[in-house]
Amino acid sequence: MTDGTQRRSVGSLPEPNAASSRVPAALTRFVWAMWLGTLAVVAGFVRTDPAWAVDGLVAIDGLTVVMWSVVTFFSGIVHSYSRRYLDGNPNKTQFFVRIFAFTIVVMVVVAADHIALFAAAWLAMGLLMAELIGHVDGWPQARAAARSARRYFVGGSLLVAFSLTLLWSATGATSVTGILDAVGGLSTTTALLAAGGLVVAAMIQSALIPFHTWVLSSMTAPTPASALMHAGFVNAGGVLLVRFAPVVTVEPTVMLAIVAIGAASALGGKLLKSVQPDIKGQLGCSTVGQMGFMLMQAGLGFFPAAIAHLILHGFYKAYQFLSSGGAVEHTTPQSVSDHTVGFNGVGSIIVTLATGLLGGALFAVLTGKGTLANGGILLTFFVTFATLHAARSAVKHTTLPATLRYGAVPLVFFPAIIVYGAAYEAISFLLADLPVVTATTELTLLHGAIAVVFVGTYLAIETGVHEESGRLYVALLNLSQPVADTLLTTTEDYNEY
């Protein structure tokens, strides 16, 4: 270097404290033990269908045991990964205490029956996630990201508290179960206001448009925290709607609005992802889109499908974040394979269409959805559409010879649909004790319009129509920008962390 620029050198790693170094290992083992315990709880629940509750305080039902097993499993993975990832970090013990506390709080959220306990746990969940986002407190950008997220989460918590207070004042019940039992007596105004507050709170939690900025500004979080956020924290929006399904299903207008909101975020997330230059930004926008799909399923009244979606998405996104380092490589560009032919030719089209249509039919047979003129048709349609998209991507990008490619696509996707259908049926069975498991919605012209707009916009994106507009590109780029104070633009800022 001849320009006189001084670069700070990276100092030696701090010596780990013997006592504190035992905390991460102990908490990791304890979380895995908790997961084994939750599996025993699930088994006991299936065998005896017990009424486990502390009257007016907590109530353990099918949703509780499902989410307990999922949350502790994801948390165990994150704990195990973090032991290696944070080696040498002076705040390693603090990080482990936070993710363990976060795990416990989420478990309280899905078990809480008293409305005050539910609201307090919901707030604590958001505050702990904000602390994880700002874990590297030596970065001004991390502190700014934590402040931004905290504002969103507190706002969502206030909406939850507002809805619960409104429901308490209307029903006189201080427990969630008591409120849900009395939903039938709510006035239209009360039902709309309470449901509206819960829906917006779910949108904030799940980072749906226009509340997606917090998740795109959270890239300062350590990778394990990002995995926990995208695989678990954002899912709480769906859990909120499932828990209070009797409230949000009272008015058909609310359910239709949920479908429209979900469709907008599903498409918006895909558009925003198309302009992201980095892997974490792409994963963040992918989460926005996937949570939109999850909300659509809830809006159609298929709450087990929403839970199945968020669980499977959690597995996928945890893997993607924890392996994101593998996407950053310096390699010599390779010549394009002769077998990378793209999506052209009659064979590609036939295989893609056949896989999508047969996949949708397989889902309908496995679940019984799509055989009647109700929201099940749209659910099956979106499953078919998702299968078409996945099959098209596989046919387009694979480097296998044509014969193997066309034969492998259905062999890969049909088992995946069977897994999804089996997960849907298993979760439906476990959620059978909830007040509302499935709220069949009658199809309307608006549902049809949403489907048409969804397909049209998707096709426009896939064919690259949106890339021809410079204004649209700039608009998408602006819409996907994180808060300015959260951007890490100087590599020297990383040196001491």
Locations of the language-model features?
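...captures the hydrophobic TM-helix bundle architecture rather than a specific catalytic motif
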Residues: 2-477, 481-497
